């Protein structure tokens, strides 16, 4: 009622028809560690896995983490992944999101594009094998926790930008989000974070917008050893990748 009286478009039917969905996580193996992340419409699971897969052929442990060599290599891998994000990623219930984006074979192809001596142009996205058939069916908070019974939780929640839409429905204390900005208003038009999207993330009824949330669990020998997530819009993906590298490649404690 309040939304209708104040120019909003959301009605009771919209709220009643919204259902939380259980989805299969994105999984990859990075140097003997199983990386388990969230699938589309979050781009985090796909591209955390993709970036780590691109970097796996390189022996990062031999590099200083603050060296130009390390920074260049990781940056180039991230650029390749974000080019794919802009083209392919969206709600997999509406868009054809290739599972091959997180495959080892595809990552090896992308890794060969990295020139260790200079930044290479990334003119467009690449295309993984079976892209048409093998598909996936700033004001952010992340927390990770575990209990004595062995349950591990990694959770990211967001209202998108600072204070979301800037609206609090009287009597609720709830800040309404502005997640509509995470859709691509039109192909090639940046959102508030400067991210470019394509038709895969176009607005449609009942569709969920693309996000960068990356709640991740890392396992070794089938047992969880740490969880990781972050806040910060598109930098969530890169922060999570760097945290995993620090633990797996450089031996830092979780």
Region spans (language model):
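Alpha-helical support elements that line or immediately flank enzyme active sites
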Residues: 1, 53, 230-252
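Long, well-ordered, tryptophan-enriched scaffold segments
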Residues: 1-39, 60
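Internal maturation/activation junctions in enzymes
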Residues: 8, 57-159, 171-172, 179, ...
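Active-site rim segments in enzyme catalytic domains, especially the processed small/beta chain
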Residues: 9-11, 151-220, 226, 237, ...
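Short, small/polar residue-rich loop motifs at catalytic or cofactor-binding pockets
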Residues: 22, 137-140, 162, 211-213
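Short, well-ordered beta-strand elements
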Residues: 34-40, 47-51, 143, 152-156, ...
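Short Gly/Pro-enriched turn/cap motifs at secondary-structure boundaries
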Residues: 41-42, 131-136, 201-210
């Amino acid at each position: 009622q309040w939304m209708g009286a104040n120019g909003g478009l959301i009605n009771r039917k919209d709220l009643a028809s919204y259902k939380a969905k259980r989805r299969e996580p994105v999984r990859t193996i990075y140097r003997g560690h199983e990386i388990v992340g969230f699938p589309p419409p979050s781009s985090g699971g796909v591209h955390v896995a993709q970036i780590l897969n691109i970097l796996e052929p390189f022996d990062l442990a031999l590099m200083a983490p603050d060296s130009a060599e390390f920074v260049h290599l990781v940056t180039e891998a991230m650029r390749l992944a974000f080019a794919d994000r802009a083209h392919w990623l969206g709600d997999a219930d509406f868009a054809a999101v290739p599972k091959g984006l997180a495959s080892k074979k595809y990552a090896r192809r992308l890794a060969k594009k990295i020139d260790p001596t200079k930044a290479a142009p990334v003119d467009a996205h690449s295309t993984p094998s079976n892209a048409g058939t093998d598909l996936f069916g700033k004001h952010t908070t992340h927390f990770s926790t575990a209990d004595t019974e062995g349950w591990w939780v990694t959770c990211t929640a967001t209202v998108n930008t600072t204070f979301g839409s800037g609206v609090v429905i009287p009597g609720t204390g709830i800040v309404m989000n502005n997640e509509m900005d995470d859709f691509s208003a039109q192909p090639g038009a940046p959102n508030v974070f400067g991210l470019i999207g394509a038709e895969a993330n176009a607005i449609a009824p009942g569709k969920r917008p693309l996000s960068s949330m990356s709640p991740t669990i890392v396992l070794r020998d089938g047992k969880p050893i740490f969880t990781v997530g972050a806040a910060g819009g598109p930098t969530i993906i890169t922060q999570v990748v760097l945290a995993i590298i620090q633990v797996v490649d450089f031996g830092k404690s979780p």
